[in-house]
Amino acid sequence: MSDKLRQIAFYGKGGIGKSTTSQNTLAALTEMGQKILIVGCDPKADSTRLILHSKAQDTVLSLAAEAGSVEDLEIEDVMKVGYRDIRCVESGGPEPGVGCAGRGVITSINFLEENGAYDGVDYVSYDVLGDVVCGGFAMPIRENKAQEIYIVMSGEMMAMYAANNISKGILKYANSGGVRLGGLVCNERQTDKELELAEALAGKLGTKLIHFVPRDNIVQHAELRRMTVLEYAPESKQAEEYRQLAQKIHANGGNGTIPTPITMDELEEMLMEFGIMSAVDESVIGKSAAELAAAV
């Protein structure tokens, strides 16, 4: 494993556009001459679909189940090579409601390390579900694999709530390992004062807003063709946005911070400061519209 290897991770709540953002950013990094390995750590197994032009890659866990055990697999069975020679692996997870989805993450990373998948690459990128930072999904952080965490969020309250929760997970392991918060990436949802809120949250968490990715329908057009914007429309404004994000991440090595998570009350206070949320009158909690009208 190379001394200069950068191990980064993209975390974010489900549906925030984390996998799309990460794949486009990593594609942009290859234009800068960087060699990339993607390790998908999301049970949806969609962390590599735009790179491989596929619906979903076969996962380490599903292939291991077919073969008998992970020891019966070869690295070629689980690692596929896609756009601009990006190496792709999906860890996978168990059937819904059965077992720990994080188990696939642990199994995959151990298998990849033991079989030389990290050799000759400049970046390993973990794409991780981040609604809950449970033990399994926190594995890239806990085991000191991912050194730089980039949280994909938006100006929506639950996306900011998830970003704060992920920061708590990073803080828990920051002192025992070397993991740091690299910064926030705001994937625009066109909510009120979104840029200002993202910058304010970054300040509260003791980090910075790495990049504000504007909303553009070209992303959806590319996704329908299972392609990154970099491949589908390389001359587009959106492709340039991802190039800028890639350049900022590339220049950010060693600049991560130990996050300073906030409370739910502080998050709500921040929303009130920006006029997104009004102070709540406790006397109206739990009252229906009809009850409130009758009380007038």
From Swiss-Prot:
It catalyses: N2 + 8 reduced [2Fe-2S]-[ferredoxin] + 16 ATP + 16 H2O = H2 + 8 oxidized [2Fe-2S]-[ferredoxin] + 2 NH4(+) + 16 ADP + 16 phosphate + 6 H(+). The reversible ADP-ribosylation of Arg-103 inactivates the nitrogenase reductase and regulates nitrogenase activity. Its EC number is 1.18.6.1. [4Fe-4S] cluster binds at residues 100, 134. GO terms for molecular function: 4 iron, 4 sulfur cluster binding; ATP binding; metal ion binding; nitrogenase activity. PROSITE patterns: NIFH_FRXC_1, NIFH_FRXC_2, NIFH_FRXC_3. Signal peptide: none annotated. CDD domains: NifH (cd02040). Belongs to the NifH/BchL/ChlL family. PANTHER family: LIGHT-INDEPENDENT PROTOCHLOROPHYLLIDE REDUCTASE IRON-SULFUR ATP-BINDING PROTEIN (PTHR42864:SF2). This is Nitrogenase iron protein. It comes from Acidithiobacillus ferrooxidans (strain ATCC 23270 / DSM 14882 / CIP 104768 / NCIMB 8455).
